[in-house]
Amino acid sequence: DLINKFNYTKNVNIPKLKKIILNINTTPTNITHCLIPTMLSLELILLKKSKLTNSKFSNLNLKIKKGNVNGCKIILKKKKMYFFFFKLILDILPKINKRFVIKKNTIFYKNFSFKIETILMFSELEYYYKFFKNISFLNITIITTTLNRYEFFFLFKTFKFF
């Protein structure tokens, strides 16, 4: 559909998903209780090691010091990215009551970010509620190779994401 609609001459120019970034941030007061469960939850969902993220700036109002651990993240590419993307479309998004309301003026055409407020929607974590109940929301960023907004929306509509 993309080839017919946008008249691509080369297969390299066809827009596709580049990578998916999953990130969980923790508050400074909660860091000791939630750091190990957040890392473990991402590893259970994706079967991949997570990396710790550090704060780049200090903020005295939030009691954050520069260089302290904030949370953890995983970057997905290639097969694992598509596996997670289809799992997200087929399993997780139908469970969410809210639909995505997207403003065409504020969205960037290269990436799309949203958050899942309850991480317990994943089937791998449902049975272990007592271990993962204190985890904050999951930030998901999907990065594409689209050149304009029309390609971006058409790409996600072909995946039936919107």
Which stretches of residues belong to each language-model region?
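Ribosome-associated RNA-binding proteins
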Residues: 1-162
